[in-house]
Amino acid sequence: MAELSNQLMALTVLAYLAAMVSYAAEYAFGNRSRVGRAAVRPARQLVGAGAPTDAVEVPGDLPPSDPASSAPPRTPLDRGALFGKVAVGVNALGVLLHLGTLVTRGLAAGRMPWGNMYEFILSVTFVGSVAWMVVLTRRPGVRHLGLFVALCLVVLNGAAALVAYTPVGPLVPALHSYWFLIHVSTIIIASGILLLGAVPATMFLIRSGYDQGKRRFPYTLGKRVSAAETLERLTFRLHAFAFPLFTFGALIAGPLWAEASWGRYWGWDPKEVWAFISWVVYACYLHARATPSVKRTTATWIALLGFATMLMNLFGVNLFFTGLHSYANAGGM
């Protein structure tokens, strides 16, 4: 089972890589697909009663033309739409392979596959990939984000395999507790959703810069993604959903488990410190997002700072710090 899990892991990364290439192809031919046309559809400025009935052009508008002549050409094969559908299908295949990787890993170990850094990363990226498929189902217009979601999945899963791989083994004694299921599962779910939330947050900043007339890299990447308002709203909803879960897992279940295992609720262990820092930063983001005087771009930068602290907690603490949570370098959580 352990060897099968490793093989499925390799296939998972390949599937996400193929999905990324397909998303990139749709991105390149985006104006020909329905999703691409929705992303770049020109806005029209509304005029009040008594004003001229002609539409007023705003920057980015297309000149008025005959509806028949402005319609996209009908071709036997709409390459953009085809690549997009292939990308979603391959992405879904990657999710199934990802699930198989975790299931076979758990069967081989005789426990939930959350016992070390390698398994934790695989579980977080799995939650992120499932959350992405749910978002796609509810908001198909944001499909162009798939290129960047798949890129994150490939990079993180590849890093898990190259840097954090740990052979299947039993749990360390400190993890033999029912709190293991409660604490770690909520942290995994919250982290996976926050991972996904970082993608529209980044693209919102890029799209906002593009809308302001910036035409250098990386702002040119914003040309074919959804409207900035759509991306910002998706960013907020993902973070608002994940934050209560992260609060429960990091600041309630974690301290209760610590008291049961080590006789104290909080010991300022490096991972505890960085989890608290992440919580504070994400709380600041939600507060800034709810404050009318704070620009949405400023609030979004705070959200990305929160994600940076999560990465520090995952890689930096596990690989470079010693503490109660770093049980065996990359093998610990």
List where the protein language model places each region:
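Polytopic transmembrane helical bundles with strong interfacial aromatic enrichment
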Residues: 1-333
